[in-house]
Amino acid sequence: MFDSPWLSVFPEASRITLPRECDIYAPGEASDLVFFIERGAVVEIRTDHLGTSHAVGLSGRGSLVGARLAATNTSNMSVRATTITETVVRSMHRSVFLHATLRNPDLASAYMTQLARRLEVARHLSEVCSSTRAGDHILGVLHTVADVCGADVNGNASIPVPSSLLERMTGTPQRIVDATLRELRTRGIVELERDAIRWVM
């Protein structure tokens, strides 16, 4: 078990294991839960009124995720939080979380650090996804996953990103995703599995 100040806040009884590509919250869902990621990773994907999607948030082990922490409140956009790989989370009601956090200076400081990190990752993903080249979208998103979530247990590559999820994370058609990944594999940048991709560390 890794060391985190949130382990003493989120009840162990709330721990659940979620399969990959499982939604923690969906567009329009008025969830008041805050989730602590004990293991795994979650991506937040925004879809605008035209149906265009791209990643706006990425959280790994030790991070907090919640619908009320989403990066947008505008009515013409929606955010969905989805697990990238099998993920273990704990949860608690937002009001209980805020009460426990704000009365403890150490937790309040840790919470502000979390929010600052979320903003930094969101800004980086925005820059990556605004690239005019689709290949750069894919390269940038995979590199960000490796940077935020670190290596998988083998230490040689990042956690696996499902290919179907990568399409939504980048807003890139699957045929372009597939062609780009084949090129990246020949250059030794990624490893391709049956239905997932790993960034080579």
Named regions from a protein language model:
Residues 34, 56, 89-90, 158, ...:
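A residue-level structural signature of the nucleotidyltransferase/glycosyltransferase Rossmann-like core
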Residues 11, 57-116, 120:
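Cyclic-nucleotide recognition modules
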Residues 6, 22-85:
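Cyclic nucleotide-binding regulatory domains
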Residues 145-201:
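Phosphate-/nucleic-acid-contacting segments
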